Amino acid sequence: MADLLTVTGLTIVRGGRVLVQDLSLSLTRGAVTALTGPNGSGKSTTAWCLSLHDRDCTGEIAFEGVSAADMSPRSVRALHRRTIALQPQHLLLEDSWSVARNLRHAAWSLALPWRRRSDLVSEVMARTAVEDLARRRVDSLSGGERMRVALARTRLMREPGLVVLDEPTAGGDEGLSALVTGMLDEWVGSAAGVLVVTHDQRLVERAEHVIRLGDEPAA
């Protein structure tokens, strides 16, 4: 199967500090790749770059054979609406809004058909077990509940080609871990490629491929 995303010589520098140097990798459809390593090794920043949200990195990134350097801003926005689903570390949630309003807004931002938005929001809320939280403000939720809402937001994209998750089991319990594992299986089953930034050994063991940043020794 052809590579979904290829990276050659990725280097990331922030504040004069080299976070990632000369990283090369490839992501394929129908597989989970775990990105792990110690805190401060650049995992989250790497995920942000690979999802094409951060262009302030050097090296070559190509999505389905097209260089990111050759993509127009409009093309990148289209990928973010229809093809690249991202759950970043800061979760992309508006704290002062209710859970339902956050998800409705996310459905609108993905340019989903108006008539389908309500049904789709209800569907993903049920899938991620946040129906009972619909009217609660995000800033009243626990860490695990917030993560479930963030996963629901990510799940709104119906047929992503690439899914990028940053610490999706952080602050959660066994139920959240089981939810994430099930969602990984669903995405892989629909031929999406998944990149998951994680310290969770269960997700590392679930992955077909593991990339370690920093000085963490290989298992």
Show where each model-derived region lies.
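The feature captures the beta-strand-to-loop junction immediately N-terminal to the Walker
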Residues: T36-P38
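Helix-to-loop junction immediately C-terminal to a conserved catalytic motif
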Residues: S51
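Conserved ABC transporter NBD signature motif
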Residues: G59-A69
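ABC ATPase NBD coupling module
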Residues: A68-I84
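Q-loop/switch helix immediately C-terminal to the Walker
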Residues: H90, D95-S109
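Conserved ABC ATPase "signature" region
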Residues: R104, R116-L133
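Conserved ABC ATPase signature
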Residues: R137-L141, E145
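Catalytic Walker B motif of ABC-type/P-loop ATPase nucleotide-binding domains
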Residues: V163-E167
